[in-house]
Amino acid sequence: MPKKTKLKNSNKMDMINGPIWNKLPRFALPVAATAILEQLFNASDIAVVGNFTGAAKTASVAAVGANSPVIGLLLNLFIGIALGTNVIIANAIGRDDRGTVQRAVHTSVLTALIGGFLVMIPGEIFAVQILSAMSIPEDVLPYAVLYLRIYLLGLPVILLYNFLSAVFRSVGDTKTPLIVLALSGCLNVLLNLFFVIVLKMTVNGVAIATVISNAISSIVLFIVLMKSDKYIKLSLRELRIDKRVLGQILEIGLPAGIQSAVFAISNIIIQAAINSLGTIVIAASSAAFNIEVIAYDVFNSFSQACTTFVGQNYGAGKLDRCKKTLLLSIAEDTIATAVTIGLVLFSGRFLLSIFTSDPQVIELGYTRLLLIFSAYTFSMLYEIMSGYLRGFGISLVPALLTTIGVCGTRVFWIYVVFPSSPTFKTIMYAYPISLSLTAVLIFIALLAYHPSRRFKGAVSAE
């Protein structure tokens, strides 16, 4: 009979006992708020250099923006790997395996730091070549290289924050990372203003501010874990990599990370097609993207909740609760997504006017919102179903199907369909088509695997 796991900290959540319906939003909404805050704080970098760097403001804004694809690829890859940490610890907590929890926590910390250094070193060496390959204008390149090199210096602590956040999420504590991010984000904004306005720096100022604020947030989470209960307590003496646990983390996390990286590449290809349509279209698409990502953060947070709840209950052998988690996640996420989309569409033109006063840009941006949101139900469904499968440790299948359904379809669409009808709407149709196809593929995989039945015998035998 599975043991009941007790968690001491009030921020933590008992996922394997009691009602599920009221705990899912308590887990998911802080995750959504954290992601939205990250978007806002990242935007502050551009806002500060765009307003306070004098003659260099145009090049500075372009330099920060030009680094987004590179930084996005790196972060998406390692955030995916951190998901493996979340699942492994959640499974171990569910089966009351304190030893595995401890090994996973300490392995994750070193994985983040070592991974950061392994990427940082070649990144520093080849920064010029990487950014030059992206056809960045000559007047922007020096600023872009400066920003990237400073950012890479802080990559180990930036990755550490994401891995430590995954540890907290695995026990249901999504509030602590949110509070720490909110405080460090405010510090980031203040440092941006200090370095750029007072010290007259440009992109180097906002890059240094980003590194410092991330370092502080990582240190705070590190200290909190050192003072935590025995389940996820961190000890400097115990810092070592457990090869078996690392293998399990990578088995789940690496496919998710590669999926996110390939996802980013497909979006770069779409962005290139958008860029070919001129300045107005680029401005409209960029403004709309900054709005629609908020809705994505909301429904994706329920996917993370589903993964963690399923992970713990699978570890505890409570497969009926796993299935119930899936159904409740879909139901509650549908409501949350519908409310978010409704609010965004109702105020869409006003929100777009924050970014631009050009009526043509606003209308094109609203067109993008309508087409993207028409398929967000499908996106929500495949994210939840993928999260459910990952909770059982099935990570490669949703990663492959998402790569085929989303990335493959979009690349095909841009290179085959778009040339015959090179309009903004043609590009945007790639989103509902790819998202709906992926939802169907993941649903078929869910029916084929049927984890709650497939693992029933294995759990009973343990």
Task: Report the location of each language-model feature.
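Short alpha-helical transmembrane segments in multi-pass integral membrane proteins
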Residues: 1-28, 89-154, 198-254, 310-375, ...
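Transmembrane helix-bundle signature of multi-pass secondary active exporters and lipid flippases
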Residues: 32-87, 151-158, 247-312, 333-340, ...
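Helix-loop interface residues and adjacent transmembrane-helix termini in multi-pass membrane transporters
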Residues: 40-43, 52-58, 92-95, 170-171, ...
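Alpha-helical transmembrane segments of multipass membrane proteins
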Residues: 43-47, 121, 163-167, 186-197, ...
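Small-residue-rich hydrophobic transmembrane alpha-helices
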Residues: 61-121, 158-177, 284-348, 379-402, ...
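Short runs within selected transmembrane alpha-helices of multi-pass transporters and secretion channels
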Residues: 79-82, 151-169, 177-188, 206-221, ...
